[in-house]
Amino acid sequence: MKNYLLQIEYFGRNYCGWQRQSHSPSVQEELEKALSKIANQNIEVTCAGRTDTGVHATSQIVNFYSDAERPLSAWQRGVNALLPQDIKILAVQQVDNNFNSRFTAINRTYNYIIYNSATSSPIFAEHCLWENRELDIDKMNQACEYLLGEQDFSSFRSSQCQSNTPFRNIQKAEFIKQGSFIVFEVVGNAFLHHMIRNLVGSLLKVGLGFESPEWIKVVLEAKDRTQAAETAKAHGLYFVGVEYPEFSFKRQIIKLFC
């Protein structure tokens, strides 16, 4: 039995998220269906981060076990031929049998993309959040400083979150402006359900001048979801990287745009 690692890219608009669902299309279901056909046996996959409905990935990492003797090209080109156009395998390699894409991961990186312009873009409308009002990135980055380290993120956790603990360790949270795009890059050991989108929704209030940077600290300490802002839309969020002890994978979405 061999263990294979796949680097996956997908556009999440047409899916209920990563995780297999009984009555809705999912990325996991499409991938497992294609892999199983190539392997001529049932294949189940594990992913580094389970993305929500409408969320995308430029570098999702997946692993699966199979005793089917296939060249690596079959696991990539062969499977890609069976996958829909909005899901593709970028790379494949054999890894140690102890490797687990979820539990071996040290941290995960997400990008949230905001198109900050007076006029919306027909090209980027489905790829990022449009905000026509000017955002104060300096204040947003001041607010981000309160997010760093291991903390209780109950205020930014959805009511459907099934995690046993609200504590997460954030190593990086930063807004970067590139032309009309503003990229929120956040790196953490793991994330709660809707956590990043809830953070973005609140940080936008700071950027628009409705709240001070210190307000984020107050919301964190409240440990109450009702104290934070509304959830930012899913289509601006991208899973872009994973770090493991032996290697890392990262494809920043903004570099694909520019």
Swiss-Prot record:
tRNA processing as UniProt keyword: yes
Catalytic activities: uridine(38/39/40) in tRNA = pseudouridine(38/39/40) in tRNA
Alphabetical list of Gene3D superfamilies matching this protein: Pseudouridine synthase I, catalytic domain, C-terminal subdomain (3.30.70.660), Pseudouridine synthase I, catalytic domain, N-terminal subdomain (3.30.70.580)
Protein EC: 5.4.99.12
Keywords: Isomerase, tRNA processing
Active-site residues, record numbering mapped to chain: 52
Keyword Membrane: no
GO molecular function terms attached to this record: RNA binding; tRNA pseudouridine(38-40) synthase activity
A family per Pfam: PseudoU_synth_1
InterPro entries the record matches: PsdUridine_synth_cat_dom_sf (IPR020103), PsdUridine_synth_TruA (IPR001406), PsdUridine_synth_TruA_a/b_dom (IPR020097), PsdUridine_synth_TruA_C (IPR020095), TruA/RsuA/RluB/E/F_N (IPR020094)
Binding locations of substrate: 110
Database matches in NCBIfam families: hisT_truA (TIGR00071)
Subunit record text: Homodimer.
Family note: Belongs to the tRNA pseudouridine synthase TruA family.
Name of the molecule in the record: tRNA pseudouridine synthase A
Organism: Francisella tularensis subsp. novicida (strain U112)
